[in-house]
């Protein structure tokens, strides 16, 4: 059986290592699912996700000249397309942004002055 990049196949886990899992494909060939291609989240221990003998669906991601087959479990899963968000907000004009910035900076500056003056004990007067 010819194995083509991009095809989805059913396979059986035949071996697990610390860097991935070996999968026997239809036709007797074996490919490797790298640990980074097992799940969408971080996989610290592959044994938490796979066991020898498990049936898995894999996607062929590469076939090298020396016959090595790279597989992915996470790319074989059909994920629903993310819908584009419809966050339409009218753009603020430059003047609106500038007015908002000036108001915010005035508020911050006045509160900073208030806090500084209260720590000094009033309008800069020193205590005797």
From Swiss-Prot:
Residues 6-74 form the S1 motif domain. Pfam families: S1. Gene3D superfamilies: Nucleic acid-binding proteins (2.40.50.140). GO terms for molecular function: nucleic acid binding. It comes from the Bacteria. Residues 78-120 have a biased composition (Basic and acidic residues). Residues 72-128 are annotated as: Disordered. NCBIfam families: PRK08582.1. Belongs to the peptidase U57 family. This is Uncharacterized protein YabR. It comes from Bacillus subtilis (strain 168). The lineage of its organism: Bacteria, Bacillati, Bacillota, Bacilli, Bacillales.
